[in-house]
A protein has these predicted regions:
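Conserved N-terminal phosphate-binding loop of PLP-dependent enzymes in the Aspartate aminotransferase
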Residues: 1-224
Length: 224
């Protein structure tokens, strides 16, 4: 399990240990308050060479929860920056049940509202819009699973929800291919592709939370 996802490359790997020691010997920390430094620039260039064309900016965060907070703030700021004030109403988030995105306030609002670890905060965090738990991929599931809803049926329901709420939805946030802390539940890549196409059709941004799936953890560099 690699500490769920924090140690995907193993424990005490000599290359990682050596890199950490080398960095500490050079300098341990420089804040990004209007500054940068050579290791950050090198890491940025390395990351941009890995990601799909069109992704050309990196924002460094110190945890998964903070990365979700920042991604949501970017989505909200995007709509708020438009001169068309009707777009300023796009403040809600769309996600599906069974997910987990972190423990700070905004991520808690898009974790499973009934069966997750944050049910205590119902009525306090901002209410969001939830699709049903995605139907399992019966071929890759880690436990016996029955696909009681087809991808086509699920996407038909998702389109209905988007049609009814697109004017107020800023972004859709999901864990692609596998819901991590929500139970290691796999769903079909076709479901992700279909949901992205619907979001594009209804003018909704898409946020992929790949804290648990990115950088080779699911077999490819990124799951999305």
């Amino acid at each position: 399990m690699s500490s769920w996802w924090a140690a995907a490359y193993g424990y005490r790997h000599p290359d990682l240990d050596a890199a950490a020691h080398q960095q500490i010997d050079e300098f341990s920390h420089v804040m990004f308050g209007g500054l940068t430094h050579a290791p950050a620039a090198l890491l940025t260039d390395t990351l941009l060479a890995m990601v799909p064309e069109g992704l050309d900016t990196v924002f460094f965060c110190d945890s998964g929860s903070v990365s979700v907070e920042v991604a949501v703030k970017m989505a909200l700021q995007y709509w708020r920056s438009h001169t068309d004030t009707a777009l300023h109403r796009k403040t809600k988030l769309l996600t599906w049940r069974g997910g987990y995105h972190g423990d700070t306030f905004t991520p808690m609002s898009v974790c499973d509202p009934d069966n997750g670890m944050h049910t205590l905060w119902q009525g306090i965090v901002q209410p969001q819009i939830f699709l049903p738990t995605p139907p399992p991929d019966t071929e890759t599931s880690l436990r016996p699973a029955v696909e009681d809803t087809s991808v086509e049926e699920y996407l038909e329901h998702a389109e209905h929800v988007l049609h009814e709420n697109a004017d107020t939805v800023a972004a859709c946030i999901i864990e692609p291919v596998v819901q991590g802390a929500g139970g290691m539940k796999f769903h079909k890549p076709a479901l992700v592709r279909g949901l992205v196409e619907l979001c594009q059709r209804y003018n909704v941004l898409v946020i992929f939370d790949e804290i648990a799936t990115g950088f080779g953890r699911t077999g490819t560099l990124f799951a999305a």
